[in-house]
Amino acid sequence: MKKLYTSYGTYGFLHQIKINNPTHQLFQFSASDTSVIFEETDGETVLKSPSIYEVIKEIGEFSEHHFYCAIFIPSTEDHAYQLEKKLISVDDNFRNFGGFKSYRLLRPAKGTTYKIYFGFADRHAYEDFKQSDAFNDHFSKDALSHYFGSSGQHSSYFERYLYPIKE
């Protein structure tokens, strides 16, 4: 099964990993307070101590030229199956939105916080998508909150924006 490995750190440190591993498809982005690098592969990763996710639904290809929103969705063992079933069965008509590039639904290897990556041409295109019924009905905090479990036992639903690095 294809996996997505993610690590956070300084731009320089992560960029050096990328330079030292030209045979691996490593994607590096800038976040608000850090840099992030990820590798999507069926094989072994070069990243040390990454967060590990199994890719359970994918559309399109990753590119370092796109804007991404990573949505972290907390769940519990009691709700994870239902959450996963709901997200797998979502009609992927969101691919028709202007600027849409890619989508990944990820199951955590450890824990119960799922992750979704939405790739768009830029943040403006993503913000337009966030105003849609497709987003509000299937991916918003309100739409997914009943899969979170009891409060205090989980991390929060949140978004992290990943920007292309302009060199």
UniProtKB/Swiss-Prot annotation:
Signal transduction protein, which is a major regulator of staphylococcal pathogenesis. Phosphorylated TRAP leads to the activation of agr system and consequent RNAIII synthesis resulting in the expression of several virulence factors. Up-regulates the expression of most toxins and genes known to be necessary for biofilm formation. SUPFAM superfamilies: Dimeric alpha+beta barrel. Residues 67-158 form the ABM domain. Each of the three conserved histidine residues contributes to TRAP phosphorylation. Phosphorylation is essential for TRAP activity. The gene is traP. Keywords: Membrane, Phosphoprotein, Virulence. This is Signal transduction protein TRAP. The modification Phosphohistidine is found at residues 66, 79, 154. It is found in: Membrane. It comes from the Bacteria. Gene3D superfamilies: 3.30.70.100. Belongs to the TRAP family. GO terms for molecular function: heme oxygenase (decyclizing) activity. GO terms for cellular component: membrane. InterPro entries: ABM_dom, Dimeric_a/b-barrel, Heme-degrading_MO. Induction: Constitutively expressed. The keyword DNA-binding does not apply. One of its GO terms (biological process) is heme catabolic process. It comes from Staphylococcus aureus (strain NCTC 8325 / PS 47).
